[in-house]
Amino acid sequence: MRVVLICPYSLSLPGGVQGQVLGLARTLRERGVSATVLGPCDGPPPEPGVISVGPSVLLAANGSVAPLALDPPAIRRTLEVLAAEQPDVLHLHEPLVPGPALTALLAGNVPAVGTFHASGRVPAYVWLRPAVRAVARRLGLRTAVSPEARALAERWLGGACQVLPNGVEVERFAKADPWPAPATPGGTGRSILFVGRHEPRKGLDVLLEAFRRLDRDAVLWVAGEGPNTSALTATAPPGVEWLGRISDRELAQRLRAATVFCAPSLHGESFGVILLEAMAAGTPVVASDISGYRDVARREKEAVLVPGGDPVALAGGLRRVLDDATLAGRLVEAGTVRAASFSMERLAARYAALYESLLARSGSPDVRGTR
C-alpha cells in the first residue's frame, strides 16, 4: 500500500503535529507500508522518506504561530509529487489548514483520511463554516487526536470523527542514553525540564516564578525558543539553563536524565504527547490540570496535576516530586505503563486498518506488496 502523509507545518521545526506525522510514517514503514511524508521544509528534508514542498512562512494561528507553505510554488510542488507518487491513500493532518494538505484534499482524486489535532477555537471554522463543511465532506474518514479535538471538528465541520490518540515511540525514549546530570550547589544533580515554544500559552513565565520559590539545589533546563525568550531570560531567577532548540536525540536524552518534567501550559493543548514522551523515558511529570493533559496523565496516578497559571501550586507540585522518592517512583511506574498503551506501533496498526477499510469502501484495489 502506498500512503502519502501530508503535514501543513514545517517539518524542519519542532512541533507536536510534525512529530506525529514523522513518527507514524517511520512506524508504518516498519509494518511494510510505503509511507512518504510531504510538507514544508526550511532546508533539506529532516530525514529519509520526506519530500519538501518548499520553505514556510510564520503566520499567527490559534494563539501561536504556524510555519505554513501557502505560495503558488508549494501548491504546484504538492500536485507534482502526488502525480509522481500515485498514492493509494492520503493521510492529511489538519486537512483544512491552507497549504499542501488542503491542496491535496481539493484535488480530490485519492481516498483521504483527515486527522484533526486542534482544540479550543479555530476562527476559520466559525467564519467560513459552510465552506469548510463542504471541503471536509471530501474526506473519506475523519479522526481526531483527543476528545477535545473531536468535539471541535464535529461541532463546526459536521460528520462523525473517531478518536485515535497520538502515539509515542516508546523505545526511542526508554533506551536513550541519559544526558549528564547538572552541577548543583548541594551536589544532588537534580533537574527540572521544560520543552516548548516561549509564548504566553505555554506558561513558562509561571514555571520561572515557581522555580524562584524552590530551593536552589536543582537546575531548570529550558528547551525551545519563541517571541518571549528575551523578556523571560531577562527576568529569570538563577539556576536556569537556556538550551535553545534541541535535537530529537538530545530531547530523549534530557528526558531520560531529568528529575522531573514540567508542562505548565495554560490552554491550547489538545493532546499532551510530550507528557507521554517523558513517561516513556521514565521521568515523573508535573503538569497543568487542563483537558488536553488530563486525557494523557491522570491526577496522582501518572502525574501531579496543578491549577494552570498558579506559580505557588506549581512550586508545591514540583517540590512534592523532588522531595518524595516514593511518589516519584510511583509516578514513573504508572507512567511507563501508560506510555506503552499509547505506543506508535499500536497507532500505526490502527491507521493501517483504517487505510484498508477506506480502500475497500472506495472500491480501490488492495495493492499491498504490489508496488
Please state what every model-predicted region is:
Residues 4, 180-212, 221:
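Conserved donor-binding/catalytic core segment of Leloir-type glycosyltransferases
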Residues 41, 148, 167:
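Carbohydrate-associated surface elements
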Residues 151-154, 168-188, 231:
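Acidic anion/phosphate-binding donor-loop and adjacent secondary structure
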Residues 245-246, 254-258:
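Short alpha-helical donor nucleotide-sugar binding micro-motif in glycosyltransferases
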Residues 256-270, 283:
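Acidic donor-binding loop of glycosyltransferase active sites
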Residues 299-300, 304-311, 320-326:
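Conserved acidic donor-binding segment of nucleotide-sugar-dependent glycosyltransferases
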